[in-house]
C-alpha cells in the first residue's frame, strides 16, 4: 500500500497554528492526496523526533517556537537559515534532511503583492531585534536596500543583530525614531506591540514620507493601530497575515512538488478563522 505523503508542524505548543488549514486548502484545491498534521513535541524530545522524521511518516516539516534554533543544528541549513540563525522548514533531499527559513520569502513576497516597487528605496526602518527582525533585515539586504535602521528599546540587542550582517545596518535608539522616520520609505514592525493583549506601538506615522510603505508582522488583530494610521494617511500597507500565507508556499512546494498560490479565497478562509480572536 502506498503511504500518503504528509508533512507536519512541530512546536511546543502548536495547537493554535493555522498552518494545517492553509496546507489542507492547497491540497484540496490542487487535487493532491496528502496530509498535514500538528506534532506537539517538548524541547527534550525534539532532537529524536527530527532525526527520525521519516520514520514518523513525514517527508518534511515546519518548525515553530521554541525549536527554530535547534532545528538549524540538526539539519543541513541553507544560506538563509544560517544567516537568520533559525530554520522553520525542513525537507528531505535524498537521505539528507535540509532546512531553510521561509519567513524571508514570506516577508518579501507579501510586500511585493501589497506595495509593488517598494524595493526601489534607499532607507528602511525596522522595529525590533528578535528572530523575525533578523529575517526581515536579511530580506532587505537581499533586495539591495542600502541603509537599514534597526531600532530596539535595548540598543545592545539591535547592535547584536547588526553585527551579524556585513551591510549598512544601523542600530538606532528608540528615542531617536523621530529623526529617522522622515527618511524611511519603509517601516516594518517586528515587535509584538499592537498585538491583541499587548500595548500599542507608539510611532508617529505622520513623520514618514508620503510615499512610504508600512508592514506589520502582527496578524491578531489583522489591522493593527499602526496599519490603521498608515492607511488613514494613504500609505501602502502589508499585514502579518499576508506574510504568514506567503511563507507557507515554499514548504508546500518542497514537500508536494507543486507551487501553490496565495488566493483571495485562502485569505478569506483564514480571516474567518481569526475573526473570533
Swiss-Prot record:
What would be an example GO MF term here? Answer: shikimate 3-dehydrogenase (NADP+) activity
Record-stated family: Belongs to the shikimate dehydrogenase family.
UniProt name for this protein: Shikimate dehydrogenase (NADP(+))
A Gene Ontology biological process in which this protein takes part is: chorismate biosynthetic process
In UniProt terms, what function does this protein have? Involved in the biosynthesis of the chorismate, which leads to the biosynthesis of aromatic amino acids. Catalyzes the reversible NADPH linked reduction of 3-dehydroshikimate (DHSA) to yield shikimate (SA).
E.C. number(s) listed in UniProt:
1.1.1.25
Disulfide-bonded cysteine pairs: these are: none
Catalytic site positions: 68 (proton acceptor)
Please indicate which superkingdom the organism of origin belongs to: Bacteria
- InterPro entries referenced in this protein's UniProt entry, alphabetically: Aminoacid_DH-like_N_sf, NAD(P)-bd_dom_sf, SDH_C, Shikimate_DH, Shikimate_DH-bd_N, Shikimate_DH_fam, Shikm_DH/Glu-tRNA_Rdtase
The annotated pathway is:
Metabolic intermediate biosynthesis; chorismate biosynthesis; chorismate from D-erythrose 4-phosphate and phosphoenolpyruvate: step 4/7
- Residues engaged in binding NADP(+): 128-132, 152-157, 217, 240
Of the GO CC terms on this record, one is: cytosol
Assembly, per entry? Homodimer.
Q: Which UniProt keywords apply?
A: Amino-acid biosynthesis, Aromatic amino acid biosynthesis, NADP, Oxidoreductase
Q: Which residues bind shikimate?
A: 17-19, 64, 88, 103, 219
* Gene name of the record: aroE
